[in-house]
Design a protein with these regions (language model features):
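Conserved TIR/SEFIR loop-to-helix hotspot centered on a Trp-containing motif
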Residues: 128-129, 155-185
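C-terminal interaction surface of TIR/SEFIR-family domains
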Residues: 1-51, 184-279
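Conserved N-terminal substructure of TIR/SEFIR domains
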Residues: 1-144, 263-279
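Short catalytic/ligand-binding loop motif for oxyanion handling, primarily in non-cytosolic enzymes
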Residues: 70-71, 94-98, 156-159, 197-200
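Glycine-rich, N-terminal phosphate-binding loop of Rossmann-like dinucleotide-binding domains
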Residues: 151
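Acidic, metal/cofactor-coordinating or nucleic-acid-engaging core segments within structured domains
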Residues: 119-122, 135, 142, 181-197
Length: 279
């Protein structure tokens, strides 16, 4: 699901709320030995994924560009207020780079040259780490009910081909491609991500690294950010009334209203358990 003009979405979230969300969702790094196993000090993919990513399914997975991080966390906080479980992996990536640096220092360092690494070993370390994270992200997407691709000017690169849209993030590209292929399952009685390559795109001198452009995968549905904001405002008001008058309220109330704004197919309605409802 693509949210267009995400740049225009302005949500009222206080700085303490933003800081609290990041604190709750930023895992602390353990000692490197916790992720190594065997005599050859092999990276333990399962241990890394289990530590950095939630094990419980989430309602909403936020897929986004690194530059939109603050606005994405504000959206996550707002959706959490409505009772939804939200995954924003931007809070994880900083630890990933710190962990990768520790791995390089332990397995790719050149004796007598601090901060200098063996290129081949460091490249393999990065490839292994990114593969581990890619699989973990796919698992999170598979376990979520809804993936929201937050499309903004920060996501895209200059488009030189008329009628074609491109993005500069390999991670967003991978997430959206996987979301197209993942099996859709009936609702049980959710999508983000920070762009890894963007976070490393500037070296110490401030130069921008070469960027690859990726054709933007199509989304099953599209919604303007203004519509999303209207739905959030309506759901927030309804939740306030429910609390005041002790009425029944569910996190699915917002998702149901969200889905009703979309031109759902018969198959999608059936997955939501709405097949028997009057059209």
């Amino acid at each position: 699901m693509r949210i267009t003009d995400f740049d225009a979405l302005r949500l009222q979230v206080s700085q303490p709320e933003l800081d609290a969300y990041r604190a709750r969702n930023t895992p602390e790094l353990d000692d490197l030995t916790a992720y190594l196993s065997g005599e050859d000090n092999l990276l333990d993919a399962q241990a890394i994924a289990a530590h950095l990513f939630a094990t419980e399914p989430v309602d909403v997975f936020l897929s986004h560009a690194h530059a939109d991080h603050d606005a994405v966390v504000a959206l996550a906080v707002t959706l959490e207020r409505l009772g939804l479980r939200v995954f924003v992996d931007a809070c994880v990536w900083g630890d990933v780079y710190a962990l990768l640096l520790k791995v390089d220092q332990a397995r790719a360092g050149i004796p007598g040259e601090p901060g200098v690494f063996n290129y081949t070993r460091a490249t393999r370390n990065a490839a292994n780490m990114y593969m581990i994270l890619s699989v973990a992200l796919q698992r999170m997407i598979d376990q979520s009910e809804l993936l929201l691709f937050l499309d903004s000017s920060a996501v895209r690169v200059q488009d030189y081909v008329e009628g074609e849209a491109y993005i500069g993030s390999p991670w967003i590209f991978a997430e959206l491609m996987f979301a197209q292929m993942v099996a859709r399952r009936p609702r049980l009685a959710g999508i983000g991500t920070e762009n890894l390559s963007e976070a490393l795109a500037r070296n110490e001198a401030g130069a921008t690294a070469p960027m690859v452009r990726y054709r933007l995968p199509e989304s099953s549905h599209t919604m303007p950010s203004a519509t999303l904001k209207r739905l959030i405002s309506s759901a927030t008001f309804a939740a306030t009334l429910a609390t005041r008058f002790r009425l029944r309220s569910s996190s699915y109330d917002f998702l149901d209203q969200f889905y009703r704004e979309l031109p759902l197919s018969a198959a999608e309605r059936e997955l939501l358990g709405w097949a028997d409802e009057a059209r």
